[in-house]
């Protein structure tokens, strides 16, 4: 894929940068793998806002993606690469030798016609899925499980990947893009290569309306609110924050560590912020 900078024919297109999608499927998605997706607009069952800045947006179906890749030993041919409105990565439609079709996260460099396979005996080839114990040290991987058989949870977004650093006993060490080094059970599965659509981070939407299409509502700064609405609010005329930056609920907003899961602390070998002050 490549990117293209749009000509400034209007205020909304000035500065807009898009990802060229020439190789993507132009037709409808595979209907048996679609599910209804209801929008909650960030509200809970009481109608209270639980996630701010959500609401509206275009309706779309959920594409059921196979994150487990547990159809071992059966070759699958990539039929096409598709756009998925639910994620930054593209998805690939696989057709297995027995006729079943499944969506997977499309790895970088994958094209229609490529044959993939999963299982312990699979070759070390981009798009193949194997248990980590069967993957050589130094291999770039993505779609990594955290528990055997649960399905991929790590490195699933566009351009994401991790590197297998070492294997010792029942655990392997994997370095994530954030710099964190984490222990993963060697029976967990991972896919060879990195996630495609790596130019996603270079996109510029160009106008506020493009975010509204995505269901993202405006974000209002705390300093322009009233004191009842935000710790930064109030004051006569234009005023600063008058304190350290915080969330509407008083939690420090810049660099404050919020991780609170001591149960899995022993799985982290090196924290992602170990190089920061």
Swiss-Prot record:
GO cellular component terms attached to this protein's record: large ribosomal subunit
Stretch forming the signal peptide: none
Keyword Transferase: no
Alphabetized UniProt keyword annotations: Ribonucleoprotein, Ribosomal protein, RNA-binding, rRNA-binding
Bias kind Basic residues: ranges: 50-60
InterPro entries: NA-bd_OB-fold, Rib_uL2_dom2, Ribosomal_uL2, Ribosomal_uL2_bac/org-type, Ribosomal_uL2_C, Ribosomal_uL2_CS, Ribosomal_uL2_dom3, Ribosomal_uL2_RNA-bd_dom
UniProt biased composition (Basic and acidic residues): 229-244
Start and end residues of each stretch annotated as Disordered: 37-60, 223-264
Biological role: One of the primary rRNA binding proteins. Required for association of the 30S and 50S subunits to form the 70S ribosome, for tRNA binding and peptide bond formation. It has been suggested to have peptidyltransferase activity; this is somewhat controversial. Makes several contacts with the 16S rRNA in the 70S ribosome.
Protein name per its UniProtKB record: Large ribosomal subunit protein uL2
Species this chain originates from: Neisseria gonorrhoeae (strain ATCC 700825 / FA 1090)
């Amino acid at each position: 894929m490549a990117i293209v900078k749009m000509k400034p024919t209007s205020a909304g297109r000035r500065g807009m940068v898009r990802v060229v999608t020439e190789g993507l499927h132009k037709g409808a998605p595979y209907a048996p793998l679609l599910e209804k997706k209801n929008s909650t607009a960030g509200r809970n069952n009481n109608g209270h806002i639980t996630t701010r800045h959500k609401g509206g947006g275009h309706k779309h179906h959920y594409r059921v993606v196979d994150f487990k890749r547990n159809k071992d030993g059966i070759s699958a041919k990539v039929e096409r690469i598709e756009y998925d409105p639910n994620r930054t990565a593209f998805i690939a439609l696989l057709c297995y030798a027995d006729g079943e079709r499944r969506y997977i996260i499309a790895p970088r460099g994958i094209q229609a016609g490529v044959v993939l396979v999963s299982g312990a005996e699979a070759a070390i080839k981009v798009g193949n899925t194997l248990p980590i114990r069967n993957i050589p040290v130094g291999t770039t991987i993505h779609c990594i499980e955290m528990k055997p058989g649960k399905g991929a949870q790590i490195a699933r977004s566009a351009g994401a990947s991790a590197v297998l650093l070492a294997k010792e006993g029942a655990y392997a060490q994997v370095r994530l893009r954030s710099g964190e080094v984490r222990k993963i059970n060697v029976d967990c599965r991972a896919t060879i290569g990195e996630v495609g659509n790596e130019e996603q981070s270079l996109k510029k939407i160009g106008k506020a309306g493009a975010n509204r299409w995505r269901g993202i509502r405006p974000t209002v700064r705390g300093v322009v609110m009233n004191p009842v609405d935000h710790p930064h609010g109030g004051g006569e005329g234009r005023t600063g924050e008058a304190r350290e930056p915080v969330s509407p609920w008083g939690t420090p907003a810049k660099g404050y560590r919020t991780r609170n899961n001591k149960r899995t602390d022993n799985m982290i070998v090196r924290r992602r912020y170990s190089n920061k002050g």
